[in-house]
Design a protein with these regions (language model features):
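Divalent-cation
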Residues: 1-93
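Cytosolic-side membrane-entry/anchor segment at the start of a transmembrane helix
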Residues: 2-13, 17, 99-136, 140-144
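Polar-ligand-bearing catalytic/cofactor-coordination segments
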Residues: 3-14, 18, 22-24, 150-218, ...
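Multi-pass alpha-helical transmembrane bundle typical of ion/small-solute transporters
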Residues: 47-49, 66, 70-95, 107, ...
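Alpha-helical transmembrane segments of polytopic integral membrane proteins
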Residues: 73, 80, 130, 134, ...
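Membrane interface segments of multi-pass transport proteins and intramembrane proteases
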Residues: 100-109, 138-155, 234-244, 263-273, ...
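Transmembrane alpha-helical segments and their cytosolic interface motifs
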Residues: 110-128, 208-233
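Juxtamembrane "helix exit" motif at the C-terminal ends of alpha-helical transmembrane segments
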Residues: 122-147, 223-247, 251-254, 258
């Protein structure tokens, strides 16, 4: 009698590659591990932010998760840059005069608000590059060569995907970013090893794939693809109005993309394999093979955040 196939365990534990380090996020704690110039690994533990009611509402939680990820990621990226340069992390030492004034007069909430603004500003620049620019280019082309509605839709889609891929290729050629993408690979391999039930050692982690279906890169390419389909129904009468509609629909685009990512992470069938395949392809640009020292950092980052009962961290 054939035994039913055992479903592979999938964890909600995940992370982010940093400058010479990795941040791992578990159900209760987050840990940032950074390789210092002297070869040692410095770790920093923080409680995982509490999830409010909004994070449980489908479609809404996608945009919230994206914004939270940007803010937390920016904070840890700054921390890792400081530690990897050889200085002990001291927030007071690295504060500018303006930041110190804000902290002294307005308190920590104002500092957090400034950090959020910095992260959101980065997001707005990305929106300008991947959402607004393709529409403006199509509008410019249409000024010289009259295009039909679907010609505009196709051209905008090609431009959007082209700009996205060109951006990824360009930044992957930068030495510092290339190392971040190698740490990205170490993060994926470590999670895969944990999900397989193997002991977290360098030898065990090394043998696992660097590609992961629930990667942030997969989410980004889903956002691009979903936006192509959703924005195709918007009017082209006014370029300014079209850009406005696209910006208003962006939270919905992120929400749909997030739900698709969660579905693909939980299910394994023909539909989910097709949906997640573009993300795996693009990971060839953002996830590289790590060396053993990077795997050591990933293990140091993930070990403190793993729940005692793996079921508490099930995806």
């Amino acid at each position: 009698m054939n035994q039913p196939k055992k479903e592979r365990f999938k964890t909600s534990v995940g992370g982010q590659a940093l400058m010479e380090g990795i941040m791992m996020r578990g159900p209760k704690q987050m840990c940032c591990a950074v390789r210092k110039p002297d070869g040692t690994i410095e770790t920093k533990l923080d409680p995982t932010p509490a999830h409010g009611v909004w994070t449980k509402i489908p479609l809404v939680r996608g945009a919230i998760a994206m914004i939270e990820s940007m803010i937390v990621g920016y904070r840890y990226m700054m921390y890792s840059a400081q530690v990897s340069m050889g200085d002990d992390y001291d927030p007071e030492e690295e504060e500018t005069a303006f930041e110190k004034w804000v902290g002294d007069h307005l308190g920590k909430k104002a500092e957090d608000a400034l950090l959020a603004c910095a992260a959101v500003l980065g997001g707005l620049l990305a929106i300008l590059l991947f959402t607004v620019l393709p529409t403006l280019i199509v509008g410019g082309v249409n000024h010289f060569v009259t295009l039909g509605r679907w010609a505009k839709v196709v051209l905008e889609a090609v431009l959007k995907v082209g700009i996205f891929l060109t951006y990824m290729v360009a930044i992957s050629k930068m030495k510092e970013i290339h190392r971040v993408f190698e740490y990205h690979g170490a993060e994926h391999k470590t999670i895969a090893c944990y999900e397989a039930g193997d002991e977290l050692t360098v030898e065990n982690v090394r043998k696992y794939t660097r590609f992961h279906p629930r990667c942030g890169t997969s989410f980004l390419i889903l956002v691009v693809i979903v936006s192509v389909f959703l924005y195709s129904v918007l009017p082209w009468g006014s370029i300014g109005l079209r850009v406005l509609f696209k910006l208003l629909l962006l939270p919905l685009v992120m929400g749909i993309s997030y739900e698709l990512l969660k579905w693909c992470g939980r299910s394994d069938n023909i539909a989910t394999r097709i949906i997640r395949q573009p993300g795996i392809w693009v990971q060839h640009l953002t996830v590289f093979e790590p060396d053993d020292s990077m795997i050591e950092v990933a293990i140091a980052a993930v070990t403190p955040v793993l729940p005692e009962d793996p079921e508490d961290g099930r995806w």
